[in-house]
From Swiss-Prot:
CDD domains cross-referenced by the UniProt entry: PT_UbiA_Cox10
Organism: Anaplasma marginale (strain Florida)
Reaction(s) this enzyme catalyzes, per UniProt: heme b + (2E,6E)-farnesyl diphosphate + H2O = Fe(II)-heme o + diphosphate
UniProt keyword annotations, A-Z: Cell inner membrane, Cell membrane, Heme biosynthesis, Membrane, Transferase, Transmembrane, Transmembrane helix
Protein name according to UniProt: Protoheme IX farnesyltransferase
Purpose of the protein: Converts heme B (protoheme IX) to heme O by substitution of the vinyl group on carbon 2 of heme B porphyrin ring with a hydroxyethyl farnesyl side group.
Note from the entry: Carbon 2 of the heme B porphyrin ring is defined according to the Fischer nomenclature.
Entry EC number(s): 2.5.1.141
Family note: Belongs to the UbiA prenyltransferase family. Protoheme IX farnesyltransferase subfamily.
Length: 301
């Protein structure tokens, strides 16, 4: 594996070894799905209308932009990906794609997505998309991830852009409504990632990545609970602009209360984190975001 990684890192692996599936994996498709859904939410709740074709173009641009950010992330982090068990099967450390190919893929997708968004949709959404790619690829991946245990807190800004981009695709503006969804994702991100980081902290130690659990497990548990409570408050803010606020608040409160219950289970543990508690929170946090945004869509119309 080490020899293969060194070979691919220097860009000497034959391009013929790369398949379509390898490039799809390079773009982090699971994250892309969540990004696309939150962007579509922004479109659906925005005032006004958008031509279906333009809406489709905007959605594809957001997906490609997210893929570009993922490619840049794997390009830059290929050294630590090769060390961690959770990531050593990714295309670059596995020898399926070389670093130069990943860089080129990221550049092509980033340029194409922003350019098409500017020409076909509007300049506001294009600038926001460019900002999102830059935030994840440069601010989080290159500047924060290896330098501070608060990396995922500040880096969460990148993942919070999509609903704002979706809103701007329709209206060409920013708004408190779209910023409300931005805030939800921003606050949701730390407990979501810290839950899985608690289970993989030894790998982060080995890779010398200063995730918060590496420094203090107890502090991480406290922060998870704190952010979960803040999320419940922020998650209630769409009730200020939806058409059916009472229904929204009832459903959002139920979802947030369950989130807090999972966070409490993690917080109450002593010693080493358990798979049951941490994975329970991690998996539910994904359902939470999908369901909460679905409730926003349902209660706006």
């Amino acid at each position: 594996m080490t020899a293969t990684f060194i070979k691919t890192s220097r860009g000497k692996s034959p391009a013929s070894l790369s398949s379509v599936g390898d490039y799809v994996q390079l773009l982090k498709p699971r994250i892309m799905c969540l990004v696309v859904f939150t962007a579509i939410t922004g479109m659906l709740i925005a005032p006004g209308t958008i031509h279906p074709l333009i809406g489709l173009v905007s959605t594809v641009c957001v997906a490609l932009g997210a893929g570009a950010a993922g490619a840049f992330n794997m390009w830059y982090d290929s050294d630590i990906d090769a060390i961690m068990d959770r990531t050593k099967g990714r295309p670059i450390p596995a020898g399926k794609i070389c670093r130069e190919q990943a860089w080129e893929c990221g550049m092509v997708l980033a340029t194409l997505s922003v350019f098409v968004m500017a020409i076909a949709v509007n300049y506001v959404s294009a600038l926001l998309l460019a900002g999102s790619i830059f935030s994840y690829a440069v601010v989080y991946t290159m500047l924060l991830k290896r330098r501070t245990p608060q990396n995922i807190v500040i880096g969460g800004i990148a993942g919070a852009f999509p609903p704002v981009i979706g809103w701007a695709s329709v209206s060409g503006t920013l708004s408190l409504e779209s910023l409300s969804l931005f805030a939800i994702i921003f606050v949701w991100t730390p407990p979501h990632f810290w839950a899985i980081a608690l289970l993989t902290l030894e790998e982060y130690k080995k890779a010398n990545v200063p995730m918060l659990p590496v420094y203090c497990i107890r502090k991480t548990r406290s922060h998870i609970l704190l952010y979960s409570i803040i999320l419940a408050v922020v998650g209630a803010t769409p009730g200020l602009f939806v058409k059916h606020p009472v229904l929204y608040e009832i459903l959002a409160t139920g979802l947030s209360a369950t989130f807090i219950a999972y966070a409490i289970a993690v917080f109450r543990e002593k010693g080493q984190p358990s798979h049951k508690a941490c994975m329970g929170l991690f998996k539910y946090s994904i359902y939470y975001l999908f369901l909460l945004f679905a409730v926003v869509i349902a209660c706006v119309h």
